[in-house]
Amino acid sequence: MGLELGFRELGEVPYEPTWHAMQRFVAERDKSVMDEAWLLQHPAVFTQGQAGKAEHVLFPGDIPVIQVDRGGQVTYHGPGQLVTYLLLDVRRLGLGVRELVSRIEQSLIGLLASYDVQAVAKPDAPGVYVDGAKIASLGLRIRNGCSFHGLALNLDMDLRPFQRINPCGYAGMPMTQLRDLVGPVDFAEVCTRLRAELVSRLGYAEQKTLTGGIELT
């Protein structure tokens, strides 16, 4: 039997407790545990990765800034953005970090192609871009051969908070979102398409819908 990827669709959840839930999942899992992907949205928050520099947070205002343990620099999460946390046994999948990042990017490119949007990845700047504007960000952490954190895809959101930072450390980085490219977006349909892309590109045999939430403490 091939590997399954389990999906939890969690709705809108606060950032910090969700981050701690990821950490617990990775710390407590063993080789028998199914890999999971959590699909969700966050209230407005800036997260500063391990490589982040304070000067890239320009004027956060009333939006909190949280220092976290993923790779990369500062980014923004908010309602209308699809965040997907990838809790994967990378060793079991037989993937190196660069290959994992590439396959996640290809999943997003494939998803966007299903909406007739031509997107590309950049070797020097992880993420996915449409006509030079960033539509999706990536940031991962690997611990004991297992990944956490993941991707953020802009669907139908207020992009103005990105102007308060240098996204991923790039001053003036233009941002875009699916709504501005194709019109109204069905969040649930995007989730369905992304699930299929991730299962295919990451090499799973099938997907499974996991019921129940996560412990937010």
From Swiss-Prot:
Q: Which GO terms describe its molecular function?
A: lipoyl(octanoyl) transferase activity
Organism classification: Bacteria, Pseudomonadati, Pseudomonadota, Gammaproteobacteria, Pseudomonadales
Q: What's this protein's family per the entry?
A: Belongs to the LipB family.
Would the keyword DNA repair turn up in this protein's UniProt record?
no
Q: Write the protein's name.
A: Octanoyltransferase
- Write out the annotated subcellular location: Cytoplasm
The family database entries (NCBIfam families) matched by this protein are listed as: lipB, PRK14342.1
Q: What Gene3D superfamilies would the database entry show?
A: Bira Bifunctional Protein, Domain 2
The cross-references to Pfam families, in alphabetical order and at most eight, read: LplA-B_cat
Supply the alphabetized keyword list: Acyltransferase, Cytoplasm, Transferase
Give the pathway listed in the UniProt entry for this protein.
Protein modification; protein lipoylation via endogenous pathway; protein N(6)-(lipoyl)lysine from octanoyl-[acyl-carrier-protein]: step 1/2
Q: Tell me where the signal peptide lies.
A: none
* BPL/LPL catalytic domain segment(s): 31-206
Q: Which residues form a coiled coil?
A: none
**Other comment:** In the reaction, the free carboxyl group of octanoic acid is attached via an amide linkage to the epsilon-amino group of a specific lysine residue of lipoyl domains of lipoate-dependent enzymes.
Species the sequence originates in: Pseudomonas aeruginosa (strain ATCC 15692 / DSM 22644 / CIP 104116 / JCM 14847 / LMG 12228 / 1C / PRS 101 / PAO1)
Grouped into one coarse class, the protein's main location is cytoplasm
Query: What's the Enzyme Commission number for this chain?
Result: 2.3.1.181
Q: Could you provide one GO biological process annotation from this protein's UniProt record?
A: protein modification process
Gene Ontology cellular component terms for the protein in this record = cytoplasm
Recorded hits in InterPro entries, A to Z, give: aa-tRNA-synth_II/BPL/LPL, BPL_LPL_catalytic, Octanoyltransferase, Octanoyltransferase_CS
The protein's job, in short, is:
Catalyzes the transfer of endogenously produced octanoic acid from octanoyl-acyl-carrier-protein onto the lipoyl domains of lipoate-dependent enzymes. Lipoyl-ACP can also act as a substrate although octanoyl-ACP is likely to be the physiological substrate.
Residues reported to bind substrate: R70, G71, G72, Q73, V74, T75, Y76, H77, S137, L138, G139, G150, L151, A152
EC main class here is transferase
This protein's superkingdom? Bacteria
